[in-house]
From Swiss-Prot:
This is Centriolar satellite-associated tubulin polyglutamylase complex regulator 1. Keywords: Cytoplasm, Cytoskeleton, Microtubule, Phosphoprotein. Residues 1-111 are annotated as: Required for interaction with PCM1. The modification Phosphoserine is found at S319. CDD domains: DD_C11orf49. It comes from the Eukaryota. Regulator of the tubulin polyglutamylase complex (TPGC) that controls cytoskeletal organization, nuclear shape, and cilium disassembly by balancing microtubule and actin assembly. Regulates the assembly and stability of the TPGC and thereby modulates polyglutamylation of the microtubule, which antagonizes MAP4 binding. It comes from Pongo abelii. Residues 318-331 have a biased composition (Acidic residues). Belongs to the CSTPP1 family. The gene is CSTPP1.
Length: 331
């Protein structure tokens, strides 16, 4: 049944809001590229299974990064897939480096950019070296904020730099790839980085940014709540506050609450069913549980992003940012 919000929108606005044209274009491109294979079971079936995979969130698996980040739904689907595929890392209490987490991301998206992984790791590690170990929950919640709100955070980084240098915070921000957090970190590492900026003024700038930003932004009321207990803050302190805010995680809707991060009964049941179908595999996995968690050092090369959808596997995908949690195993 259609929701009241859907009925209140004109058709063209609803189609734009849901990025339907993006998925139609992608479906047609895949249809044309694989028409010989698809002709064996029919075009209607292909479109049915394609849009079923979009609804289930499996359509982003093994796709190019430009498609993975193309829509908010794609980003949520990728976050959920990453969590569901690799939460065993957290259950086993394994600690991995930034490069190892990047290898895991490349298993789902072969051309996933290293820069995004580095930015997410910096939220957790702060001033620590980039080769330090991180818990799965720490990295996951930081990665969620950095990946989903990537364009917004680039603009926030430029605003923070202007405030820190005393420039007019109302200047129109046009962020570029060279002005984001990764390049900005050394420039903000002086005394000003330690002192930060006034939280109330920073929030006013963010509120104005959210009003005019065409990309996804955290709900302003939740951002205000996250900053309510501080008078001054640093840029990475702000990112850490976002990553561990319960309400922002709920509003984004990709990951479960912190206490439920390692629990996914439906996925466990599906994995047990699949493992039971492979002779000899269950015993080997039981004997060496950590083997399934090790990241591949060489990401797979995918010749074509399309996979016959009726044969595709069904896969969907904590952070307090503290040094204590990063340095010890999950329970």
């Amino acid at each position: 049944m259609l929701s009241p919000e859907r009925l209140a929108l004109p058709d063209y606005e609803y189609l734009a809001q849901r990025h339907v044209l993006t998925y139609m274009e992608d479906a047609v491109c895949q249809l044309l590229e694989n028409r010989e294979d698809i002709s064996q079971y029919g075009i209607a079936r292909f479109f049915t299974e394609y849009f079923n995979s979009v609804c289930q969130g499996t359509h982003i698996l093994f796709r190019e990064f430009s498609f993975v980040q193309a829509t908010p739904h794609n980003r949520v689907s990728f976050l959920r897939a990453f969590w569901r595929c690799f939460r065993t890392v957290g259950k086993n209490g394994d600690l991995l480096t930034m490069k190892e987490y990047h290898c895991l991301l490349q298993l789902l998206c072969p051309d996933f950019p290293l820069e995004l992984t580095q930015k997410a790791a910096r939220i957790v590690l702060m001033d620590d070296a980039m080769d330090c170990l991180m818990s799965f929950s720490d990295f996951l919640f930081a990665f969620q904020i950095q990946f989903y709100y990537s364009e917004f955070l680039d603009s926030v980084a430029a605003i923070y730099e202007n405030l820190l240098s005393g420039k007019n915070p109302n200047t129109v921000i046009v962020p570029t790839s060279s002005s984001g957090q990764h390049r900005q970190r050394p420039a903000l590492g002086e005394a000003g980085m330690l002192e930060g900026v006034e939280a109330s003024l920073f929030y006013q700038c963010l509120e104005n940014l959210c009003d005019r930003h065409k990309y996804s932004c955290p709900p302003p009321a939740l951002v205000k709540e996250a900053l309510s207990n501080v008078q001054r803050l640093t840029f990475y302190g702000f990112l850490m506050a976002l990553s561990k805010h319960h309400g922002i995680n709920q509003a984004l809707g990709a990951l479960p609450d912190k206490g439920d991060l390692m629990h996914d009964p439906a996925m466990d049941e599906e994995l047990e069913r699949l493992l039971a179908q492979v002779p000899g595999l269950v015993n080997s996995v039981t004997a060496s549980p950590e083997a399934s968690c090790l990241p591949s050092r060489t990401p797979p090369r995918v010749g074509s992003p399309w996979r016959p959808l009726h044969h595709s596997r069904k896969v969907d995908g904590e952070s307090d940012g503290s040094t204590e949690e990063t340095d010890e195993s999950e329970t």
